[in-house]
UniProtKB/Swiss-Prot annotation:
<feature type="binding site">
    <location>
        <position position="140"/>
    </location>
    <ligand>
        <name>substrate</name>
    </ligand>
</feature>
<dbReference type="Pfam" id="PF09296">
    <property type="entry name" value="NUDIX-like"/>
</dbReference>
<dbReference type="InterPro" id="IPR022925">
    <property type="entry name" value="RNA_Hydrolase_NudC"/>
</dbReference>
<dbReference type="GO" id="GO:0008270">
    <property type="term" value="F:zinc ion binding"/>
</dbReference>
<dbReference type="InterPro" id="IPR049734">
    <property type="entry name" value="NudC-like_C"/>
</dbReference>
<dbReference type="GO" id="GO:0030145">
    <property type="term" value="F:manganese ion binding"/>
</dbReference>
<keyword id="KW-0862">Zinc</keyword>
<dbReference type="InterPro" id="IPR050241">
    <property type="entry name" value="NAD-cap_RNA_hydrolase_NudC"/>
</dbReference>
<feature type="binding site">
    <location>
        <position position="190"/>
    </location>
    <ligand>
        <name>a divalent metal cation 3</name>
    </ligand>
</feature>
<dbReference type="GO" id="GO:0006742">
    <property type="term" value="P:NADP catabolic process"/>
</dbReference>
<feature type="binding site">
    <location>
        <position position="132"/>
    </location>
    <ligand>
        <name>Zn(2+)</name>
    </ligand>
</feature>
<feature type="binding site">
    <location>
        <position position="235"/>
    </location>
    <ligand>
        <name>a divalent metal cation 3</name>
    </ligand>
</feature>
<feature type="binding site">
    <location>
        <begin position="208"/>
        <end position="215"/>
    </location>
    <ligand>
        <name>substrate</name>
    </ligand>
</feature>
<keyword id="KW-0464">Manganese</keyword>
<feature type="binding site">
    <location>
        <position position="194"/>
    </location>
    <ligand>
        <name>a divalent metal cation 3</name>
    </ligand>
</feature>
<feature type="binding site">
    <location>
        <position position="194"/>
    </location>
    <ligand>
        <name>a divalent metal cation 1</name>
    </ligand>
</feature>
<feature type="binding site">
    <location>
        <position position="127"/>
    </location>
    <ligand>
        <name>substrate</name>
    </ligand>
</feature>
């Protein structure tokens, strides 16, 4: 028997009564000792500086709404926590919900005005879209497809680090898909651009929503074909082959990057394959 999803997205009517709500400001999401969801009626009594409200779905059957604040404010007994911290710890279903909420918030903030004429937009009832009446344009949440690939050579894996990474951490190669390009073409191009290596036997492994701010990560495994590593200037601080028994600090456990690495380690050792987060 299939288990129902704890979190499901939906476009809910903000005029409806009741339900729960999550609250986002420039400091992250509101949190207390019970979590990041609050009774909607209780929040209404706090006189929060709400910029917009959105019905985003159901968590364990309860309707959930998003309140986007104009600025962060102090709420007694509560604190603000960034989205990445929710990813690293706690209930992963809650992170999935907040990740969706963050993307809705980004979309609503970036599409308050039409990009064609500059006029104010309105949210379409029953649809996740903003509308410009003047240009008859519907503006939907942005999703940016990107690839991430683990390149392997026997008992070695190719890992790299960006100057933006946490000190010492290495990860799989990644990059955004260009217009007119397939995900597979993107993998070959990005690997060549970033490390000057050719790959073969490309295999799709799975995908993960990456709401920082709106990526869809498409995960791949590839085998090394030819070429010596030459890191791309300014983009890649270091790249090298690591033996699977001597790896550097790796990405967070709940990331698709970590899954690709753990899946290959399991394959080499004969251990059970890990589960892709999300």
């Amino acid at each position: 028997m299939a288990h129902p999803e704890r979190w499901t997205t939906a476009v809910l009517d903000v005029e409806a009564d009741g339900g729960l709500a999550v609250v986002q400001s420039d400091q992250g999401f509101l949190l207390d000792t019970n979590g990041a969801m609050f009774p909607r009626g209780w929040l209404a009594g706090l006189d929060l500086p709400v910029q917009s409200e959105h019905g985003i779905g159901y968590f364990e059957g309860e309707p959930v709404y998003l309140l986007v604040l104009e600025r962060s404010v102090a709420v007694e007994g509560c604190s603000w926590q960034g989205l990445r911290q929710f990813m690293l710890e706690g209930d992963f279903a809650v992170f999935q919900m907040l990740g969706y909420a963050a993307q809705v918030s980004t979309w609503a903030r970036e599409h308050r005005f039409c990009g064609a004429c500059g006029r104010a937009t309105v949210q379409i009832r029953g649809e996740r879209a903003m509308f410009c009446e003047h240009d008859n344009l519907r503006l939907y949440p942005r999703i940016s497809p990107s690839m991430i690939v683990l390149v392997t050579r026997g008992d070695e894996i190719l890992l790299a680090r960006s100057p933006r990474f946490v000190t010492g951490m290495y990860s799989a190669l990644a990059g955004f898909v260009e217009p007119g390009e397939s995900a597979e073409d993107c993998v070959h191009r990005e690997v060549m651009e970033e490390v000057q290596v050719r790959i073969k036997n490309l295999k799709y492994m799975g995908s993960q929503c990456w709401p920082f701010p709106h990526s869809m990560m498409l995960g791949f495994h590839a085998e090394y074909d030819s070429g010596d590593i030459v890191p791309q200037a300014e983009e890649i601080e270091d790249a090298r082959w690591f033996h699977i028994d001597d790896l550097p600090p790796l990405p967070a456990n709940r990331s698709i990057a970590r899954y690709l690495i753990e899946a290959y380690l399991a394959e080499r050792s004969g251990a059970p394959e890990p589960v892709l987060p999300g």
